[in-house]
Amino acid sequence: MWLFHGYMPEFNQKGEKMSGKQLKISEKKRFPVFTFLFFFILLCVAGFMFYMAFKEQVPYWISDFKSKQVQNEYTSFGEEADGTLPYDFADKKNEKKNTKEKPAKTKNIPQDWNGVDWNGLKKMNPDIIGWIRIPDTAVNYAILKGTSDNYYLYHHMDGSYNILGSIFAEKGTSLQLDDAHTILYGHNMASGQMFGQLSNYTDTDFWKNHSYVYIYMPDRTMTFAIYDVYNCLDNDETYTIGFTLGSNDFEKWIKKTLKKGYYSTEFKPAGDEQIITLST
């Protein structure tokens, strides 16, 4: 590396001519200094790159830690069982207080009724209106609704700032999530957090093993079958809302979405059935 070579004078500081031996000794004394400098700079560059990579990952680690902390503190979902219908809040209210009878087992539905500490969640953040969960995936988060559609793009479910944001509904969405068409948004994170695993649904095997989405509300549990998977632009008619259940417009919209899917599924919704869209 010529940048690390210095000019070797022919005479020493006393004005005496230096012999070949002296020159050789001088070179040996100076070379380690430049070697040290080279490795020092290299170490600094490597350290800086490591620091930047570490700094970039910190928000992801913090978000993951805080999300799991909320999940562990405020939710407790049981194992899935066999059957077809969810154990709803209405069934819970109709049970006798001291009965030891368990609800009928259901297929792909959490065995416990709700498993969410709504009082605790509401105290943590009043903007929480529900909870979304796809078993055996990273999708296990509170659903939020803020006064602005942009707020929870960059705020955690506890209300603190975080670049990963949260799962949220548009500000015009019903607080009961009972609109004909509800859209829930979440970032498409390469880490798999938030809605980062939705891209896995391009694989039919993944869909077969994760074909239900569960929405938990303070008064009920809703089960949605995933009937369509596709990519679209943000101005696509997929994002149309404001439908009325059972209306012709809603039925036409459903038929159009069925034509967009990457593959056909066994589920075909009717115009009187509520639809949710998970969007990144």
Which residues fall in each region the model found?
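Hydrophobic H-region at the start of alpha-helical membrane spans
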Residues: P32-A46
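Solvent-exposed, non-transmembrane regions of membrane-associated and secreted proteins
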Residues: L42-T280
